[in-house]
Amino acid sequence: MNVDNKILIVGGGISGITTALEAAETGYEVILIEKSPTLGGRISGFHQYFPKMCPPTCGLEINYRRLRSSRKIEVHTLSEVKYISGEPGAYKVLVEKKPSYVNDKCVLCDHCTAVCPSERKNDFNYDMDQTKAIFLPNAMAFPSRYVIDREACETGCEKCSEACKYDAVDLNMKEEEFEFDAASIVFATGWKPYDAKKLKNLGFSSSPDVINNVMMERLASVSGPTKGRILRPSNQEPVESVAFVQCAGSRDEKHLPYCSSICCLGSLKQANYLLEQNPDSRISIFYIDIRTAGKYEDFVASVQSHPNVEMIKGKVAKIDQEQNGKPVVDAEDILNQKMIRREYDLVVLATGMEPNLKEQIPLKEIQLDEDGFMHPDFQKPGIYSAGTAKRPVDVNSTIQDSTGTALKAIQTVRLN
């Protein structure tokens, strides 16, 4: 690679992938760093996403094909930036890469999982099921190979290595560090759902049938823990009644003081999942205000006007668990000026977007706003943010923003 032309992109979700492809296909060298075992980010766990309401395969597979054919993008998964120093056109970067214990000889034959005696919680499905200690991160994993969670392995176990006919398992892999120079840097570090355990009154920790919105996406997905059937986590029975609790943590000075932008549309979309599976489902959506940015008026109107969808303006005070195990919601109904208490099969908390940048920044000069987002106006030249690292936005807006960010990164390279 030409040192002078390198662009570092931190984060391998849809934002980072888009930025990398746009820069590389313009002729610039890119290093793409992702801390998880696979690219794809949050979108890879969705059942469907706007604007076309298609599964992530329809967007990610095209981008993965472009990545495979590009000679200008160097991808490092299980990697984190530990240190950055320098100035625009001449940044020095230190990256730490963790071992996957499986090399690129892996052909996904699955012989290893057949003999593996250990299991681990499946973080891709938000711990709603389990995988073996050697596992494929998800059905669309890129790179497409297994990974070993050594912490889940039995001491001294080498059964997966013995079962592999392709010498793909390497239990002697070590953590490594490498350094390189980069002309410009883009943080496309994405978001995480706000920790619903902090919302003590909403029953997330006390009832298995109180879940958050990203867990709902996995329940609806054919690659999820229930193969696409929306069932109660507690007993795997079909869901007949659901409550969606909007602004679970968002627009709350004690938690996330801002609107997370996507939650209202997300809940209406998920209500539609339920109606498609069971048109007789009874759905209540508890909201403060319905905020649906973008050109989705017809979709919003169609869901809200469904006879089995009840829009209830009011805050949820608390969620308890009845003796029969079902969650019960106590809430205010502002328009009808009364308090209500109702039992549901399932409660979905529309938890807000929290920026991943809050966790760790390897460059002191980076400025975050009070909510943890990387405001573009306050950054050192040559350092940029893209997508939800900048502000809460949906997938479509993230892609548009990332395309523009690629151009900014390219301009830094050309000016230096």
Each PLM stretch: what is its role?
Residues 1-416:
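Residues forming the flavin
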